[in-house]
UniProtKB/Swiss-Prot annotation:
Belongs to the NDK family. The gene is ndk. It is found in: Cytoplasm. Its EC number is 2.7.4.6. Major role in the synthesis of nucleoside triphosphates other than ATP. The ATP gamma phosphate is transferred to the NDP beta phosphate via a ping-pong mechanism, using a phosphorylated active-site intermediate. It comes from the Bacteria. This is Nucleoside diphosphate kinase.
Length: 142
């Protein structure tokens, strides 16, 4: 099934200047980057986006990391895009990620793990709308 999913290239990717390499993994998997933009999250935006993790011990360090520098948000499209992107991202902990995945090959540690990807169709729709306006999304269909 043709799907869209949200991808975030986290601050570590931009700081280390490996955006092109990460995008190559995405594109080589058959996924298409249909829209992307760079942004700098405010603390409030980061807390809203990751609200589901508010009670977790890693919430504050996650927010601190996500506001530490620019991110790139992308909408990816392809067959089974959600599960495919999660597969090429690799496990959250890069030590447990399979070789050849983004996190195994590029992530420095579990906190600076390079990428975020939606985990379900509902979350993909919600997360895409969090970062992209109706106008931006309409342009994709026009």
């Amino acid at each position: 099934m043709l799907e869209k999913t949200l991808s975030i290239l986290k601050p570590d990717v931009i700081k280390r200047n490996i955006t092109g390499q990460v995008n190559s993994y995405i594109e080589n998997s058959g996924l298409k980057i249909i829209i992307q933009k760079m942004c700098l999250l405010t603390r409030c935006q980061a807390e809203e986006f990751y609200a589901i993790h508010k009670s977790q011990h890693f919430f504050v360090p996650l927010i601190d990391f996500m506001v530490s520098g620019p991110i790139i948000v992308q909408v990816l499209q392809g067959e089974n895009a959600i599960s495919l992107y999660r597969e090429i991202m690799g496990a959250t902990d890069p030590k447990k990620a399979s070789p050849g995945t983004i996190r195994a090959d590029f992530a420095e540690n579990i906190d600076a793990n390079c990428v975020h990807g939606s985990d379900s169709l509902d979350n993909a729709m919600r997360e895409i709308r969090f970062f992209f306006s109706d106008y931006e999304l309409l342009a994709l269909n026009g």
